[in-house]
Design a protein with these regions (language model features):
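Positively charged, polyanion-binding regions of nucleic-acid-associated proteins
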Residues: 26-47
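Preference for short coil/turn "hinge" residues that link or interrupt alpha-helices
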Residues: 16-17, 40-41, 93
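Non-transmembrane, amphipathic alpha-helical segments
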Residues: 20-24, 45, 86, 113
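Extended assembly-interface/linker segments at domain junctions
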Residues: 55-59, 63-133
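Intrinsically disordered, low-complexity serine/threonine- and proline-rich regulatory segments
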Residues: 1-31
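Alpha-helix N-cap/helix-initiation sites
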Residues: 25, 46-50, 80-84
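Short, charged, low-complexity loops and linkers
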Residues: 11-15, 35-39, 129-133
Length: 133
């Protein structure tokens, strides 16, 4: 009877959870969702160059209280004071977690795009907004 509950609990607690679930579980989910929507959806673009995405995230970090979003066990982010360095670490972390891609273009310059997991999460969030109003 509680098999479905156990399956869901296991899914949410697993280190191998799908990227969409990792995104919802992240302490920094509001920041991630805000930033990804802003950079990839407000003006639809396929790819954003790595250096540009880092620069834009650093600008956002300068305007918010980012320390509220740092996970307790994230020593790298706790030790970095500069917003550009934090942005670089976050972009790489988001790529490692499957929220965005990190791949070279035809010239060998690295760029990012949304993964299908993040696309679906943003679509779902949009559907919630439409129902709220």
């Amino acid at each position: 009877m509680f098999e479905e509950y156990e399956r869901l609990r296991s899914l949410f607690e697993s280190r191998n959870a799908p990227a969409a679930i990792k995104l919802f579980r992240a302490k920094s989910a509001p920041l991630i969702l805000f930033f990804l929507r802003r950079e990839f959806k407000q003006t639809p673009v396929g790819f954003v160059p790595h250096t540009e995405l880092v620069r834009r995230l650093a600008s956002v970090l300068d305007k918010i209280s980012f320390r509220d979003y740092i996970e307790e066990d994230d020593n790298d982010l706790q030790q970095v004071l500069d917003s550009s360095e934090k942005a670089e670490l976050l972009i790489r972390k988001w790529s490692d977690q499957g929220f965005i891609t990190f791949e070279p273009d035809e010239k060998g310059m690295y760029q990012h795009s949304l993964t299908s997991h993040s696309e679906k999460v943003l679509q779902w969030m949009d559907s919630l907004r439409k129902e709220d109003f």
